[in-house]
Amino acid sequence: MAVGKNKRLTKGGKKGAKKKIVDPFSKKDWYDVKAPAMFNIRNLGKTLVTRTQGTKIASDGLKGRVFEVSLADLQNDEVAFRKFKLITEDVQGKNCLTNFHGMDLTRDKMCSMVKKWQTMIEAHVDVKTTDGYLLRLFCVGFTKKRNNQVRKTSYAQHQQVRQIRKKMMEIMTREVQTNDLKEVVNKLIPDSVGKDIEKACQSIYPLHDVYVRKVKMLKKPKFELGKLMELHGEGGAGGAAKASGDDTGAKVERADGYEPPIQETV
């Protein structure tokens, strides 16, 4: 075969020489994720986003991003089976300001509670907070042996199950309906709702392991920057610095479409 006739060899050589390896991380920026003021630890971590290029704005790629965080990390606590979902609602500088988006229990906690010889009682209810957030709350509880009981099973009768379920729904509705989202989250952190249900149902059938196992966000009111700033302790500067023990920058009080005025002289 004549020299220079092998097209595949020459083609491959040219292509290999031209190809440049571009590091994808060179086009990206790191943003800090900030939790609302209800939690002790405000610095959740960092998130990555592609830099602003033409009409594609970086902050638009961050808005609506959901972070799932263990309550132990948010409260510097030992109780790690409760997970909170936080959604990015606004970006101020290099900070992503988040808001409550849901709550869940870990799979291993749920599985550890389900056992033989007891009745599992579940209830769910859709409730609206005073500030217009529509939440769906799921509750779970388990029957337990009475103090002087000899029999190994502790099954509740169907009528008792219905009474307990009714009580669960009543308490969940009452606790959410009369409060705004901030107060509801403050009740979910120690799960005071579950303790109230356990106490109220004691007369029907003794319960244990009563938890609000899940909270879903169904509807939100129209986004207001002022309300988000309130949740973050007026711009998320002073409160965050105290809670996380590091400097998080100055107070931010700019509107969403803010543009600095044009200066005559530089």
Swiss-Prot record:
Q: Which residues fall in a compositionally biased region of kind Basic and acidic residues? A: 244-257
Name listed for the protein in its UniProt record: Small ribosomal subunit protein eS1
Source organism phylogeny: Eukaryota, Metazoa, Chordata, Craniata, Vertebrata
Q: Where in the cell is it found?
A: Cytoplasm
**Coiled-coil segments, which residues?**
none
**What does the UniProt record say this protein does?**
Component of the small ribosomal subunit. The ribosome is a large ribonucleoprotein complex responsible for the synthesis of proteins in the cell.
- Residue ranges of the region described as Disordered: 235-266
Name one matching Pfam family: Ribosomal_S3Ae
Q: Which family does it belong to?
A: Belongs to the eukaryotic ribosomal protein eS1 family.
Instruction: Name the Gene Ontology biological process terms.
Output: chordate embryonic development; translation
Assembly and partners are described as: Component of the small ribosomal subunit. Mature ribosomes consist of a small (40S) and a large (60S) subunit. The 40S subunit contains about 33 different proteins and 1 molecule of RNA (18S). The 60S subunit contains about 49 different proteins and 3 molecules of RNA (28S, 5.8S and 5S).
Query: Which cysteines form disulfides?
Result: none
This protein's GO cellular component annotations are: cytosol; cytosolic small ribosomal subunit
Q: List the keywords (alphabetical).
A: Cytoplasm, Ribonucleoprotein, Ribosomal protein
One GO molecular-function annotation for this sequence? Answer: structural constituent of ribosome
